[in-house]
Amino acid sequence: MQDSSLNNYANHKNFILMLIILFLMEFARGMYILSYINFLPTVTSIAVAITSLAFSIHFIADASTNFVIGFLLKKFNTKIVLTTGFILAFTSLFLVIWFPASPFIIIFSAMMLGIAVSPIWVIMLSSVEEDKRGKQMGYVYFSWLLGLLVGMVFMNLLIKVHPTRFAFMMSLVVLIAWILYYFVDVKLTNYNTRPVKAQLRQIVDVTKRHLLLFPGILLQGAAIAALVPILPTYATKVINVSTIEYTVAIIIGGIGCAVSMLFLSKLIDNRSRNFMYGVILSGFILYMILIFTLSMIVNIHIVWIIALAIGLMYGILLPAWNTFMARFIKSDEQEETWGVFNSIQGFGSMIGPLFGGLITQFTNNLNNTFYFSALIFLVLAVFYGSYFIANREKAK
């Protein structure tokens, strides 16, 4: 009994520390990717094309690394992989201090940061306890979202004081996360290493066994990300509001998401499979309706209400969807499988803005992008709704 209590305490301590590390790394990512490089064209000689390329390369590096990181963690062990990641992140962001307007350094740092964050995510997802998955995944996604947003806002404020003087803060945050890592005991599901050919075959096998999940993993991210390029224009040109009122809508959505992740996500635990199915299906349908409704709304107060509803639903849909995916994963392949899943999700988030921007540009109508996003959620609702209905008798 005492050993069990000690193990539970150790697991809880490790989980909390990993949450803090995830928060700090996402904080650094938010500072650099969402704030710093976006402001560079306005305060230095860096061209917008360079910062856009850096932004894209960051997420390409993130998604590509996720695809193989689970295998690398088991082949070289967590200490080597994570330490390498921290070195890459710290060194690349440290170089920004000395070369704040170097196109090569800006792109290189974005790529290295994308690689560095990947193993932390995979370890977090594979270390979640099954009987507390909904609750703990709520905490994981909350740490991710809070880190990104607070990092972005914090860097925005520092840039207003001076555009480049506080660049050292980004590498400092990574250094703190790096130090905290040495107080964590990370354990993988198994440590059996395989030859490269066997690992490639395993990637193919993992992919084939989870084809049912790929539409949801890929298209959810694509549908949401498709709206990113048009939302500022929608706010200022269609609803005719200031950037401050638009920011308030984003904040309201973020608050709704945070509340849901912290308090509603635990509803997923110890509930029937049908309840989980209902949350996922309701989420897809509600998203379809709300996104379609945005195309007809010109009142900012109604937009704020819709933003709150989207945030609340997102905060419980993510843990529910995560729990649904977890049921398909073999217990000894968690790192590899979560890595592949994260990679597919990353590619969805990359192609979404591309489609969203192209649809608006070639049709010259913002509403068509809303219709496109809503249609994706309709397709997901029909596809997975059919699966849930077919498997409802098996659900317990």
From Swiss-Prot:
Pathway the protein takes part in: Cell wall biogenesis; lipoteichoic acid biosynthesis
Listed InterPro entries: ATG22/LtaA_families (IPR050495), MFS (IPR011701), MFS_dom (IPR020846), MFS_trans_sf (IPR036259)
TM ranges: 15-34, 46-73, 80-99, 105-126, 138-159, 165-184, 211-231, 243-264, 276-298, 304-326, 338-358, 370-390
Chief place of localization: membrane
Localization per Swiss-Prot or TrEMBL: Cell membrane
Keyword set, alphabetical order: Antiport, Cell membrane, Lipid transport, Membrane, Transmembrane, Transmembrane helix, Transport, Virulence
Membrane topology: Multi-pass membrane protein
Gene Ontology cellular component terms for the protein in this record: plasma membrane
Record-linked CDD domains: MFS_MdtG_SLC18_like
Superkingdom classification of source: Bacteria
Pfam families linked: MFS_1
This protein's name: Proton-coupled antiporter flippase LtaA
Organism classification: Bacteria, Bacillati, Bacillota, Bacilli, Bacillales
Gene this chain is encoded by: ltaA
